[in-house]
Amino acid sequence: METFCFRVSFWVALLGCVISDNPESHSTNLSTHVDDFTTFRGTEFSLVVTTHRPTNLALPSNGSMHNYCPQQTKITSAFKYINTVISCTIFIVGMVGNATLLRIIYQNKCMRNGPNALIASLALGDLIYVVIDLPINVFKLLAGRWPFENHDFGVFLCKLFPFLQKSSVGITVLNLCALSVDRYRAVASWSRVQGIGIPLVTAIEIVSIWILSFILAIPEAIGFVMVPFEYKGEEHKTCMLNATSKFMEFYQDVKDWWLFGFYFCMPLVCTAIFYTLMTCEMLNRRNGSLRIALSEHLKQRREVAKTVFCLVVIFALCWFPLHLSRILKKTVYDEMDKNRCELLSFLLLMDYIGINLATMNSCINPIALYFVSKKFKNCFQSCLCCCCYQSKSLMTSVPMNGTSIQWKNHEQNNHNTERSSHKDSIN
């Protein structure tokens, strides 16, 4: 895990060096209403960086142009290629990792329980983002324009792209909250032994999570349109949030705070509350004979709780830099300040690093689980090698989070062993 974190830090630092090697070349003129010129998985660039030509554009809602920064904005070829390599790596790792995660859970009936279903839902949301949104992001960076900008399909993509971004991050956030609640329920109801299968309550939770995520993303599909504008005598079109009603104007004004509060703070607060309650519950169980009876049972569930906590921490680390840059832009930036260009250069650097970290979150969960659970690591390797179920004498069912542990030895079919394995199943 330490090696993995070091490699991620190295690439992020390298990306930062490429961006910051010439700060003047990356300064841009930013207005409050250009927030959504470029979109990245639920949180928008406020910086005009989609064009490969030197750009010095500010496009307010009233169509007038602000005073430009002295320096022009441009994206170096080195950054383009490094960012493209990072995006392609995330695409491959995210698609293989999340698809493998879904395959393991689908093919192994013993893993079809509540928490595994929630993490499968999490993986499916990440997979949708990786397959649909990442290719569009790479195209925008390399081509310097919106795909099919002069066709109806381009308008459809302009609606679909931010909608899926918000839906994906909503699915991630709500699933993490549901996992935290589930871990508390599992510890609080220590005597409940769950067999194979997904509980009805969990199935309802998953359906509700997806429906709510889609509903919360509807304003994105409504507000984003292809906006034509003229720059240096040339006609351009870009996909951006264009408020045309009082509701959309209100949504645009509070959007950054809404994203920070609901899509970032809420899962952290939810995890803190339920993990505190879970800790108190575990401490209350550590008494006399009850402690002995529950020792192994709670040990398994404690390990699951650590895994879920790890996923929440990774989510926080991936998304915090981007939310921080958005809040700084909202609170510190003044578009009428003549000295704003230095701040814009700093915000641009934070946005680039934050966006790449946030995008990594869509592929990092399977990797994290790979390092957290040795049993999942073995099953992951076996699944990729297409030999997960070829053992002759032993059928091992191992979950992706190292929780649903069931060993059935065909030569030693012991009733007590099977009963114990069901008790160790994640609830």
From Swiss-Prot:
It is found in: Cell membrane. Residues 103-112, 182-205, 279-306, 373-427 are cytoplasmic. The modification Phosphoserine is found at residue 425. Disulfide bonds join 158-239. It is a multi-pass membrane protein. Residues 1-20 form the signal peptide. The chain crosses the membrane at residues 81-102, 113-132, 160-181, 206-229, 257-278, 307-328, 348-372. PROSITE patterns: G_PROTEIN_RECEP_F1_1, G_PROTEIN_RECEP_F1_2. The keyword Signal applies. GO terms for cellular component: plasma membrane. InterPro entries: Endthln_rcpt, ETA_rcpt, GPCR_endothelin_rcpt, GPCR_Rhodpsn, GPCR_Rhodpsn_7TM. GO terms for biological process: developmental pigmentation; endothelin receptor signaling pathway; enteric nervous system development; regulation of blood pressure; vasoconstriction. Glycans are attached at residues 29, 62. The keyword Amino-acid biosynthesis does not apply. Residues 21-80, 133-159, 230-256, 329-347 are extracellular. Keywords: Cell membrane, Disulfide bond, G-protein coupled receptor, Glycoprotein, Membrane, Phosphoprotein, Receptor, Signal, Transducer, Transmembrane, Transmembrane helix. One of its GO terms (molecular function) is endothelin receptor activity. Belongs to the G-protein coupled receptor 1 family. Endothelin receptor subfamily. EDNRA sub-subfamily. Receptor for endothelin-1. Mediates its action by association with G proteins that activate a phosphatidylinositol-calcium second messenger system. The rank order of binding affinities for ET-A is: ET1 > ET2 >> ET3. Interacts with HDAC7 and KAT5. This is Endothelin-1 receptor.
